[in-house]
Regions:
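Divalent-metal coordination cores built from histidine and acidic residues
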Residues: 168-173, 178-220
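N-terminal secretory signal peptides that target proteins for export/translocation
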Residues: 1-11
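Intrinsic-disorder/low-complexity accessory segments
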Residues: 32-171, 212-213, 218-219, 224-226, ...
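Short, solvent-exposed turn/loop segments enriched in Gly/Ser/Thr/Pro and often Arg
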Residues: 175-180, 190, 246-254, 794
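Proline-aspartate-enriched helix->loop->beta-strand connector
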Residues: 235-250
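Bacterial N-terminal signal peptides
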Residues: 16-28
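Feature marks short, surface-exposed loop/turn motifs that line or immediately flank catalytic pockets
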Residues: 181-182, 251-253, 333, 735
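Ala/Thr-enriched low-complexity intrinsically disordered regions
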Residues: 10-13, 435
Length: 946
């Protein structure tokens, strides 16, 4: 009856013993908690076709689970941009909840690795619990993430199976709905149709994050948005998870999802335990998919995701020693089809278990997401102690590297070695590299002389032990903003309590110090050091493999902050900055008889003070020439504010709150001055929202510029000069000089939603700028005295207006026509470049003669010799020599001597053309002045101060 001995029944005595043992064990295990299921709460199961739960419903449900389950605690972690409360569910066993504060402290101590011996770390790792962060819904239209989180929390609060109970005992789960505003917006939009079959996520009328939409996953080192700040605080200051899992959509065509491991390159600054830890966690996911009979998971070459870039929710974790997991899965409450793609049916290393083409329902995607969640929780449970200890090791390694001479080997290092070898070979008359037999590059199995290896470790090229941000730089308030960005990401920053000397240089009290000897050293390095992205091509002469996001982003460069790299260990009168800080109060140097006050144009926050003055009806003048008063020289661009009680009150507050120095003068300056005045600023936007416009919107609000949004129908109505002084157009707003029938950019969302289906409040946003109707009206606006600021691809207005600029990034095709340079010849993805400036030009006043600009395959021009005679003046340009500062520039020679920012006179008005990303994601504070100056200089009148 039982031919297979594996299935033979156990003896009766053994069964009785096991029954007693299980009974005793049951007394010690938490009972299955009686909690409300999603179906009982909402009337449908999570993943049912045509059904969604919005954020308001999610919070109400989680509050109920919090009351019903002793496994869950619901906490508030911040507010959203629209004012909703962000929540986080903390799920673990009741016994762990009783010691939650202790386990949180254990995770923090291991993550920071400060003053902790190896034995002490092992003891804490044995005591602690693995902390796993799982979020959902960051990109709200990728609706699977938020919905699966509801299912996961219910299963973890109700499950009584052995695996769930083990996980609850070993792991603390942090479950976070990452975009509450977006979830309410998208779910409500989808459900607005009474007829389920008509429901669609297409055509959402606004961005699903108030300002930046999809870019909310590009904000995790800058922390500009309240949601990002809240999550960064939990990740890097409060909880320090060892693993974070960031759900996204959608999967590559013909698959169900992409899951790690990722393709190369990974970043050279983070710990090797990051990529191998990723492999460990990823293997558990793929193993579970296959074991559960869930085909369709691809990895590595299956999609373009990598671990190079810092700035996403998942990717910023790597630079904080967290294993960050991303999945991109298919699925929609409206059923979809997995298409038949023949090549996808063939198994391979990166796609071992193909999925058949089929109709796909949302519930299937929910189950896949839960499988991925459980795989991560399971591996965290089984390797609990290892994950905790490895987090300590990564922090310890970072501290050690920052405490001694160390070198980060990057592609440029290897290129220098190869160049040295090649040079010596040529001098010796040896064959050129690659000509010899065996090995790569002709080096053979024996490699090359070790002297080349030893040359890598030149003392002058070592990594810094730390960075000093001097307090006496012109725009110290912006430097303080950089420091706050670091602090919000968990970086330890110190401040000098007295003046001090390091490496032969004196620094004043109040200077900031960032030591490299800290656990988050990888993050520190990417904020101050240039990125050196490899030349990434599939084969010699082939097109470049695009990086997942930016290739270079060094934040200190982007923000224009002065800092010194300190190569040797140093100390001084330093104290830790305990949290986000303000710049020291500025000086208000004005006696009762002062005629007025000078403000420094080099300081970005001066624009806040000017905007407050103008809003209050006070006057301000922008001096066209330098001026000497009371023994002090004030450069061209200085702001002069005539004395009045109102102006004094505003400027005293600005000095205190913003750190501005307000310098009084006994007499008023003389000479020419621009007169900034309250302006009517229109910022282009479109139905569905523009992220580029949203970033400008956010930026204008931070610096207190007045503005209103303007949509295509309002532009087409004409009469623009009566409504606006300044119009701002961002990338995606202006159509190319058209080939007939070619669609303009900027219409995301509308195509799938007929006008009859658009709510009345949004109908005035429908439409697009056209060459036939809108462009002539824009020209009339400028000719009548208006000002246009055109950013990125909107600079094609120059071509529409017939201005004498030519595209610098073209070559002659064989048929004699111009064609854009192919990426095999020229390719500069998101990188920082060094540019020259004419600081005497009003558009550039307050800037130095050289600046760093963010360039992302953006426009560049050449000017004919008579351009200035025709009213076109260069303001910022690329010089000869090396341009790349951080990132990847293939064929950068094509950019040399090209114009990056220009002013053009058109009739009585002006158009300013900005090729680089001068406001990119709220990061390049060093180029904000180009935008702000344009807003005030464009329509300003010139007067003579006497």
């Amino acid at each position: 009856m039982f031919p297979n001995p594996r299935f033979r029944p156990a003896p009766r005595t053994v069964l009785v013993g096991l029954a007693i043992a299980f009974a005793l064990l049951a007394l010690r295990l938490p009972a299955a908690t009686a909690v409300t299921s999603p179906k009982d709460q909402f009337g449908f199961a999570i993943g049912d076709d045509y059904q969604l739960v919005n954020y308001k419903q999610l919070v109400a449900y989680w509050k109920k689970l919090d009351a019903e389950s002793d496994r869950m605690s619901l906490v508030e972690i911040g507010k959203t941009a629209e004012g909703r409360t962000m929540v986080m569910a903390i799920i673990t066993s009741p016994a762990n909840h009783a010691r939650l504060g202790r386990y949180k402290d254990v995770a923090r101590r291991l993550a920071l690795a400060e003053g902790l011996s190896d034995a002490g770390a092992r003891k804490l790792a044995a005591e602690g619990k693995a902390v796993v962060w799982i979020d959902g819904g960051l990109h709200a239209t990728e609706i699977l993430g938020s919905q699966q989180l509801i299912e996961l929390v219910w299963r973890m609060t109700s499950g009584a199976d052995a695996e769930t109970l083990r996980i609850l005992d070993d792991v603390i789960l942090l479950a976070v709905p990452a975009n509450p505003d977006g979830l309410d917006l998208v779910a409500d939009w989808y459900l607005r149709e009474k007829e389920p079959s008509k429901r669609s996520m297409s055509g959402v009328p606004v961005l699903y994050q108030k300002y930046i939409g999809h870019d909310n996953n590009r904000d995790f080192y800058m922390n500009t948005q309240p949601e990002t700040k809240a999550m960064s605080r939990q990740l890097y200051i409060e909880w320090h998870p060892q693993i974070l899992y960031n759900h996204h959509q959608t999967g590559p065509a013909g698959t169900v999802l992409f899951a790690p491991p990722f393709r190369d390159p990974f970043n050279y600054v983070f710990d090797p335990l990051i990529p191998v830890g990723l492999d460990l966690v990823s293997a558990s996911m793929h193993n579970r998919f296959v074991t559960e009979g869930k085909p369709g998971a691809t990895m590595r070459s299956g999609a373009g995701y990598s671990t190079w870039w810092n700035g996403g929710l998942r990717s910023a974790g790597y630079f904080h020693n967290i294993i960050g997991i991303l999945t991109e899965a298919i699925g929609n409450p409206t059923p979809v089809d997995i298409p038949f793609i023949p090549d996808r049916l063939l198994p391979k290393q990166d796609y071992p278990y193909p999925v058949a083409p089929q109709k796909w329902h949302f519930r299937q995607s929910i189950e896949y997401a839960i499988t991925a969640d459980m795989a991560i929780l399971d591996v965290a449970s089984k390797h609990r102690e290892d994950f905790l200890y490895r987090r300590f090791l990564m922090g310890k390694h970072a501290i050690e590297l920052g405490s001694k001479d160390s070198w980060t080997i990057v592609p440029g290092t290897i290129a220098e070695v190869k160049a040295a070898v090649e040079k010596d070979r040529k001098a010796e008359g040896a064959p050129a590299q690659g000509a010899g037999p065996g090995g790569r590059g002709g080096f053979g199995r024996g490699g090359v002389d070790k002297k080349y290896y030893e040359a890598i470790f030149d003392k002058a090229t070592r990594d810094p032990r730390g960075y000093i941000i001097p307090a006496d730089q012109a725009d110290f308030p912006t430097a303080t903003k950089l420091v706050n960005v670091l602090i919000e990401s968990g970086v330890a920053v110190e401040r000098a309590t007295a003046g001090f000397d390091v490496a032969g240089k004196s620094y004043p009290k109040g200077s900031f110090v960032v030591k490299a000897a800290q656990a988050f050293r990888p993050h520190v390095m990417t904020m101050f050091e240039p990125q050196d992205h490899p030349n990434d091509f599939p084969y010699p002469g082939g097109p470049p493999n695009p990086p997942y996001d930016a290739a270079g982003w060094t934040l200190a460069y982007q923000m224009g902050v002065a800092f010194d790299r300190i190569l040797d260990g140093f100390s001084g009168p330093f104290e830790k900055v305990p949290g986000v800080t303000k710049p020291p109060a500025g000086r208000f140097e004005a006696g009762p008889g002062a005629a007025g006050y000078f403000l420094d144009h080099r300081v970005n926050d001066t624009f806040i003070a000017v905007n407050r003055l103008l809003k209050a009806g006070e006057k301000a003048f922008w001096l066209k020439s330098g001026f000497e008063a009371d023994g002090k020289t004030h450069p061209a661009g200085t702001i002069w504010v005539p004395a009045s009680p109102g102006a004094a009150a505003i400027l005293q507050k600005a000095a205190k709150d913003l750190g501005l120095n307000v310098i009084g003068a006994a007499g008023a300056p003389k000479g020419e001055a621009f007169v900034p005045r309250p302006l009517r600023v229109g910022l282009w936007d479109t139905y569905g929202g523009s992220m580029a416009s949203g970033w400008i919107r956010w930026l204008l609000e931070q610096f207190e510029f007045p503005y209103e949004l303007v949509f295509a129908p309002a532009l087409d109505a004409g009469g623009l000069a009566e409504k606006f002084d300044v119009l701002i157009f961002v990338g995606g707003s202006i159509p190319r000089v058209q080939v007939a029938g070619q669609e303009a950019a900027g219409m995301r969302g509308f195509q799938q939603t007929p006008p009859a289906n658009v709510p009345e409040e949004f109908k005035n946003r429908i439409g697009r700028i056209t060459a036939e109707k809108t462009i002539p009206l824009l020209r009339q606006f400028v000719e009548a005295g208006g000002t246009i600021l055109a950013l990125d691809s909107a600079t094609v207005l120059a071509e529409h207006f017939g201005l004498p600029l030519a595209n610098a990034l073209v070559e002659m095709a064989q048929d004699g026509t111009e064609a854009p340079l192919r990426p095999e010849k020229f390719y500069v993805p998101g990188s920082i470049m060094r540019a020259r400036v004419n600081p005497a030009h009003p558009l550039a006043q307050g800037l130095a003669e050289t600046i760093d600009v963010f360039f992302d395959n953006t426009p560049a021009w050449t000017l004919p010799p008579d351009a200035e005679l025709k009213g076109v003046n260069p303001v910022v340009w690329f010089d000869d020599g090396k341009l790349l500062r951080s990132g990847w520039a293939w064929g950068e020679s094509y950019l040399r001597r090209s114009v990056q920012v220009a002013e053009a006179a058109v009739g009585k008005g002006k158009i300013f053309l900005y090729g680089p990303e001068i406001a990119f994601r709220g990061q390049p504070h060093g180029t904000f002045k180009l935008l702000f100056n344009g807003i005030y200089y464009g329509p300003a009148k010139t007067i003579i101060l006497e």
